[in-house]
Regions:
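Terminal low-complexity tails and localization/encapsulation signals of metabolic enzymes
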Residues: 1-4, 241-254
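Conserved CoA-thioester-binding segment of acyl-CoA-metabolizing enzymes
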Residues: 1-53, 75, 89
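Terminal peptide-recognition signature
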Residues: 15, 19, 33-34, 52, ...
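C-terminal long alpha-helix characteristic of the crotonase
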Residues: 20, 121-126, 168, 176-234, ...
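Glycine- (often His-adjacent) and acidic-residue-rich active-site loop
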Residues: 54-89, 106, 215
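A general structural signal for well-ordered alpha-helical segments in protein cores
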Residues: 63-66, 84, 144, 153-156, ...
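CoA-thioester-processing core
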Residues: 87, 91-95, 101, 107-161, ...
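Acidic, divalent-metal-coordinating active-site segment for phosphoryl/phosphodiester hydrolysis
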Residues: 164-170
């Protein structure tokens, strides 16, 4: 049996980490399967959005599988972390939109996985946290870099240096999650995004992500280049035509 359970609905896939007994922890096999599927949807224009969640209602992803980690040599740990970082970065760079549905506990690498997604919906009973300092290490899957970019340096230091966990209400207040709701809400959000022109959605996603690393002048030039990518598309013409005809546009990603 695979580590991911994948279901498709229209142009959206739902990926469920299928390891409820181990609180959907990040194993080597799971990370490898995530990497394979990120590569697949990044090439498949039919899939425009992915909702990523965990099996059951107790955990989204409780972080690294510490039982597996205990059997690994230092070199194997380093190799695992390299694969983890590469996979999260590939997910982040994909043209596909990723929405994490944080259905339960998301600690350590589980929160880092959610941070790699474009958007996050959190269940009312879920908790998130980068708890690594309590184990004598630091976040190794991008948490020290993605968290401050999302919620600000001070708030990120608070969470990372204390290792404390936050419930849904605080996660929303901090901006760690954008919405609170159910899996159905996350899927509906994904479907809503998929109604828009896919080339435009991808260009906007990359303009935002890449622009954060530039000064304002450089970021505005980046926006101009990304905008230019949409000018010659059939989708842009379809959007104008549909507006004039007062109907819903049918975008084909061309």
């Amino acid at each position: 049996m695979g580590e991911l359970r994948i279901e498709a609905e229209a142009s959206v896939e739902v990926w469920t980490i299928d390891g409820e007994a181990r609180r959907n922890a990040l194993t080597r096999a799971l990370v490898a399967e995530l990497a394979q599927n990120v590569a697949r949807v990044s090439k498949d224009r039919a899939v425009r959005a992915v909702v990523l969640t965990g099996a059951g209602d107790k955990a989204f992803c409780a972080g690294a599988d510490l039982k597996e980690r205990a059997t690994m040599t230092p070199d194997e740990v380093r190799a695992f972390l390299d694969q983890l970082r590469t996979t999260f970065r590939s997910l982040e760079r994909s043209d596909c939109v990723f929405i994490a549905y944080v259905n339960g506990a998301a600690f350590g690498g589980g929160t880092e996985l959610a941070l790699s997604c474009d958007l996050r919906v959190i269940a009312p009973t879920a908790e998130m946290g980068l708890t690594e300092v309590k184990l004598g290490i630091i976040p190794g899957g991008g948490g020290t870099q993605r968290l401050p970019r999302l919620i600000g340096k001070g708030a990120a230091k608070d969470l990372i240096l204390s290792g404390r966990r936050v419930r849904a209400e605080e996660a929303l207040r901090l901006g760690l999650a954008e919405r609170q709701g159910t899996l159905a809400d996350a899927k509906a959000w994904a479907l809503e995004i998929c109604e828009n022109a896919p080339i435009a959605v991808s260009a906007a996603k990359h303009a935002i992500d890449e622009g954060l690393h530039l000064d304002l002048d450089g970021a505005l030039a980046l926006e101009q280049r990304r905008y230019a990518e949409t000018i010659g598309t059939e989708d842009r013409l379809e959007g104008l035509k549909a507006f004039a005809e007062k109907r819903k546009p049918v975008y084909r990603g061309k």
